[in-house]
Amino acid sequence: CTPKELEKEREEMRKAGLLPRYSGRCKGLSEDEKKKMRKKRQPAWRLDVEKEVEKRGLPEVLVFNDLIRGGIKKDVKEIGDFVVVKSDQMPVFFFAGVVDDYLMKITHVIRGEDHITNTFSQLLLYKALSIKPPQFAHIPLILEKDRSKMSKRRGGSQVFDLRQKGYLPQAVVNFLARL
């Protein structure tokens, strides 16, 4: 499937009130169809979630214990097959993160709550690679005055910026400790 076709499919799912996910419509292509498509472009690699769940005997509902929020669960059917390596042969960030965490012997991942949904895909990757996952803690996001997510891309969210604005280090630590 082309990126345009996939985006159209996701948009249709959103309009229907469904969670956008890969439907698998290009999964069952014949070898001839695959060869034709490869002449036009490189395919992305996806994890076949249904096959992985079946192969590993995983439950239909994935659960992980978040160190802050407690048990969080998600039905595997809501996840759908997801890209692991993009068509340019670059791994997606959460696949690279799983490998990186393993190589660096990471035991705890502390990140924003906007990454909770990624965690389920990562847990499937840990299982597929037979790697023990680290513990996860998802913290509330720090928001800008306009309630948008604070972002390093927009500036003003680095310690250096706070220091330039005159904030004392103790005040920043105190603020973060009280979140």
Give the label of every model feature segment.
Residues 154, 158-179:
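A conserved active-site cap/scaffold subdomain adjacent to cofactor or substrate pockets
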Residues 2-138, 143-152, 158:
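Active-site cores that bind ATP or allylic diphosphates and position pyrophosphate for catalysis
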